[in-house]
Amino acid sequence: QTDLALLEKGWHVVYCEVGNLFGSPKAVVRWDAFYAYLVKEHGFAKKAALEGMSRGGLIIYNWAKANPEKVSCIYGDAPVCDFKSWPGGKGKGKGSAGTWKNCLKAYGLTEKEAMDFKGNPIDGLEVLAKAKVPLFHVIGEADTVVPVAENSDVIEKRYEELGGSIEVIRKPGIGHHPHSLKDPKPIVDFVLRSSKQ
């Protein structure tokens, strides 16, 4: 719904598949090339509004932290913010054993190294707060796949402590799906407002 509403307002919606790279440095490099192509070859704005759903939370945050000057805002929808939570399943969530192995491989980490890793979206938010990148999350309070307490709540607490701006819409009784909102106006307004700053 959000994408369609933005298209109706004249925005471009673009996608670069890196889901199976889990926001790893390889994914960031691929997005760097994609960004350069869009800006240089097609004249796109130099600041992008980033949108990530579920595992997309990993790349939107990790790319933004590597490129804060290129980001107008971040919209995360049921975002994975710590790979130990999903796909790792090291907290309250179920995780996904096969996907966890693929995640470790994408990062070149052992399981022990992954437990000490400090390059998840929940880490190093200072660079985004310093750049005044506004954040917006939509979460289902009953999400058992990507538990809110291990993901979005951690970002919210840490970002506010850093003086960053974050808005969160909580959907009571809703799990990981459906994504977005029946009426995407709050999300669209956030993106439009942030792009004018």
Task: State each model region's role.
Residues Q1-T2, V18, A149:
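The serine-hydrolase catalytic nucleophile loop
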Residues Q1-V13:
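Short amphipathic alpha-helix adjacent to the substrate-entry channel of hydrolases
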Residues V145, A149-Q197:
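C-terminal catalytic histidine-bearing segment of alpha/beta-hydrolase fold enzymes
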Residues H12, E17-L21, V80, I174:
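Short beta-to-alpha linker loops that shape the active-site pocket of alpha/beta-hydrolase fold enzymes
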Residues A131, F136-D143:
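Short beta-strand/loop motif that positions the catalytic acidic residue
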